[in-house]
Amino acid sequence: MTTLGQRDRRPDALGSLSVLPDETICVLLEYLAPRDIAHLACVSSVMYILCNEEPLWMSLCLRRAKGPLEYKGSWKKTTLHLEGVTQENDAYRKCFHFDGFMSLYLYKRFYRCNTSLDGFSFDNGNVERRRNISLDEFSKEYDAKKPVLLSGLADSWPASNTWTIDQLSEKYGEVPFRISQRSPNKISMKFKDYIAYMKTQRDEDPLYVFDDKFGEAAPELLKDYSVPHLFQEDWFEILDKESRPPYRWLIVGPERSGASWHVDPALTSAWNTLLCGRKRWALYPPGKVPLGVTVHVNEDDGDVSIDTPSSLQWWLDYYPLLADEDKPIECTLLPGETIYVPSGWWHCILNLEPTVAVTQNFVNKENFGFVCLDMAPGYHHKGVCRAGLLALDDENSEDLEEETHDEEDNTLSYSDLTRKEKRTRMNGGGETENREEDVNGVSKRYNMWKNGFSYDIDFLASFLDKERDHYNFPWSMGNSVGQREMRAWLSKLWVLKPEMRELIWKGACIALNAEKWLRCLEEVCTFHNLPLVTEDEKLPVGTGSNPVYLLSDYAIKLFVEGGLEQSMYGLGTELEFYDILGRADSPLKTHIPEVLASGILFFEKGSYKVVPWDGKRIPDIISSSSFDFDASMLNSEFPFGIWNKTLREHKNQGKPAPDSFGSLSSHVWPYIITKRCKGKIFAQLRDDLTWNDAQNLAFFLGQQLRNLHLLPYPPVTRPELLNVNAVHEELNIPAEWKVFVDALCQKKKDVTSRLENWGNPIPRALMTKIDEYIPDDFFVDLLHVFKETNGGDEIKPCTWIHSDVMDDNIHMEPYADDSVDGQHNSWRPSHILDFSDLTIGDPICDLIPIYLDVFRGDADLLKKLLENYGLPLIRSRSSENGTTKTADSTRKKVLSPSYRTMCYCILHEENVLGSIFSIWDELRTAESWEQVEQTVWSLLNTY
């Protein structure tokens, strides 16, 4: 569009791109690098206009920013500063102005960036206001039921007087706080820099302080307020500091900032107290998706993501479309007031002026069931909790549609099923969509939301996957806690809240399918004449990746993770290892729990059956099925032993291992019974141990690693494995070493995608340098470490590798003479647990989980371990006194323990790099893998 008499410069300036809406072009520009944007701005007048838009430079800047950010007056200047572009002569660079161009999209965005919200407050009284409400009243009328505005809760807080923008800036100006914004990067700003930004910015969706670590960054702030008496029950509080999900936030933001439409994580409830400024709130009940919002639920892991306009854009562009009956519940929050948001409620907040607030999320007996439901495997129930019946599959949705409206009213496309993702959208679209259709359809679709939907735990649980398996279904990265932490949480609640066991059991059945696993446990106990399971023993312990139950004198583990085939190889290898250990004269025997029984539990023809199994044959329940087993496996003493397990892993390297026994996985479970160790696992004692206890632990682990690594292992018998790297056969390289190196080589093929999936805190800059750090020659050099060895008394290149010596697999017992009133002051290590992840490989591999998980990077403890380990880390006669006879420098590098260990960390199938960059925070800005190697593993070179 142009004014009368002016030419339209768009066709000439954009060429073929002129057919695209401005919104689309602006989105595409965000994918370019800053320097490319600068070049593109020189192409034409319209490109100059589009490439100088501040929202574009804001997006570019936030995608590249790392660590503390300092705003330089505009986002373009800030981005150029980050890019290292000097702007000394910027004063003479005046902006160009062009006629013949108009964009409604850019104008609306400009309006949103500069509009004032002085008269934007709203309160029609549809959120109740209460003062001096009792806990009993709150529980009966509001808790997990409906929002309420509460006054008087913060009257006695020091924060009511001291949490102003100026006072906070004066006291905490140098403290960096985390910033909320739409890029995945974690960005912080010193408070003084943030306030400077806040006062000068003209952003549509301004950055705002949203810091869940403010109590650690500025501990004095925690003394300025207290949790109101209505919200002091928080069941997540029993988790230790590292496992507890984020639960409290300091919120500081300017006019126009605020949280767009969302449902709080894990369906928790929340309270939010405003200390200064004014906030406009809008809320919808559970299942009622706001207009313009799209809910994505991934069918693979149930991960939920939400596409939503900014708060300001929603109120300006979408709110006017709503009929009165479809408008949200609204209020304006004033200083000193607290709003309570129940579980599952949609809410959106817009700051009408600079504000300071504090908020906390919590779990109590009223919303506990919903929290458990949200962490249950599957995806249907997650969609229904947030989007109501609109989240159902197409065929179910159509049935419900017919009950609520005629076919010709099909104006609101709310269901779009793709292969990987179910999307539920209340349309409103972009700047160019037809809003008339939306106006006609919204009310009718909201009527459909009401029909039959209930935010009731029993109703919502009916949408759970009937075949759900907590131990095998993918775990959503969006869940508030990890799988083990969630099981540990339920286990702790079971012990600490016996009066709530009926509710906790219901939640455990929803999240874990606990009733199913309890039935399996009872069948195993009955077969082996073990005591009946008591009320205290009904839930599996939180640690481990399989259901493990601790009875009075027994520990029972059901193998389910990864499906039946993986479970059979896990138990089969463990039983083979115990057989070898039993015939060896090794002191390791006394530090591994005694095996009392093992077998297979299966459900057949309506009843459970149990058969013993010692690992030395293929059980009938499997051999009688339609599975083909080759002669080598049938003739193996342990058909599911280490080398058959290794062959399976070798065949499936780089892709998820299929479960060949999949048809049996849902009703066949291997198990093992061991004698229960007295005491506690190290994970439960970590914070209570003395330094002397920790040194004793390091001494113990050094001894037991030595014992494990000296234990003989079976020779490679599988012909397929013997042919691995046959091209190097003339070098007389031990077969097991060839197998190990080949597995590493396979892992490198998808290492970049694996690291990208893990994401933060792994620096993205280092991901591009993996090939430089681990060239393909690395694997050839690693093979050659053991060339021309003649057997004899040569130290073997490989050993048994436990693979999982972590804080939950080390058992501690109290010193018998060291207790006061039953409280023990000192603990000593007694046992190493769980040998189901055994492999054979480089002994250095066992140091990785110990140093990172058990020792948390404590170099003194690693030194203590190595002192008592006493075996060479470089097991080759080509290495003497830390040097090599080979002149090749790359071969020398491979022989370096620090380099080799760093390579193993990068290629590891578990996210050990995440642990490294969490322990050594300063390495997140590392520019090379060599820097990481020297910081973390250089100690090994002096051993």
Curated annotation (Swiss-Prot):
Pfam families: APH (PF01636), Cupin_8 (PF13621), F-box-like (PF12937). Transmembrane segments: none annotated. Mostly expressed in leaves, and, to a lower extent, in inflorescences, roots, siliques and stems. GO terms for molecular function: metal ion binding; oxidoreductase activity. Its main location: nucleus. The keyword Lipid biosynthesis does not apply. Residues 14-60 form the F-box domain. Its cofactor is Fe(2+). It is found in: Nucleus. Residues 396-438 are annotated as: Disordered. GO terms for cellular component: nucleus. Binds 1 Fe(2+) ion per subunit. InterPro entries: Aminoglycoside_PTrfase (IPR002575), Cupin_8 (IPR041667), F-box-like_dom_sf (IPR036047), F-box_dom (IPR001810), JmjC_dom (IPR003347), JMJD6_ArgDemeth/LysHydrox (IPR050910), Kinase-like_dom_sf (IPR011009). It is an enzyme of class 1 (oxidoreductase). Keywords: Iron, Metal-binding, Nucleus, Oxidoreductase. Residues 216-379 form the JmjC domain. Disulfide bonds: none annotated. Fe cation binds at residues 262, 264, 347. Its EC number is 1.14.11.-. Coiled coil: none annotated. Residues 396-410 have a biased composition (Acidic residues). It comes from the Eukaryota. May function as histone H3 lysine demethylase and be involved in regulation of gene expression. Belongs to the JARID1 histone demethylase family. PANTHER family: ARGININE DEMETHYLASE AND LYSYL-HYDROXYLASE JMJD, TRANSCRIPTION FACTOR JUMONJI, JMJC DOMAIN-CONTAINING PROTEIN. This is Lysine-specific demethylase JMJ21. The lineage of its organism: Eukaryota, Viridiplantae, Streptophyta, Embryophyta, Tracheophyta.
